[in-house]
Regions:
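Non-catalytic cap/lid and distal C-terminal segments of serine-dependent acyl enzymes
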Residues: 1-130
Length: 130
């Protein structure tokens, strides 16, 4: 983020900063977003991959330590044969932890563009309101 501030005219602060990713990037966007909730006001995950080690992301990590407004969106496809039900597991954990979030389930969506496109569309439109 310092590179962006140095080289581009950008707005700073978590109200102007988002992170989202697909598959392994989706898992990492959740990890980074929750770990650095002071930097990101918008967190998205498209078909997020499972955690490969038990200590990388725990259930207790999937909650915010402070009370603030944010957007958290997780998208999943009903026909995803790569991450299977992993996104649903994140969704269930967020519910268990009473973390408000948008659960975007794409009927007939797979681990590809027919799930990615709707996520990007809805995520960006939720952030940048006209």
């Amino acid at each position: 983020m310092p590179y962006m501030s140095k080289n581009y005219a950008i707005k700073t602060g978590k109200d102007n900063t988002a992170i989202t990713g697909f598959s392994m990037g989706g898992r990492e966007s959740l990890y980074i977003g929750f770990s650095r909730s002071d930097l990101f006001g918008y967190i998205g995950a498209m078909c997020p991959a499972p955690v490969l080690t038990t200590d990388l992301i725990t259930e207790s990590d999937l909650k915010f330590t402070e009370n603030y407004s944010y957007l958290l969106m997780i998208s999943a496809g009903s026909n995803d044969q790569i991450v299977w039900s992993t996104p649903s597991g994140y969704h269930d954990t967020l519910n268990k932890n009473s973390v408000e979030h948008v659960w975007h389930y794409v009927t007939d969506g797979d681990h590809g563009s027919n799930t990615i496109r709707p996520h990007i569309y809805n995520f960006v439109h939720s952030i940048f309101k006209a």
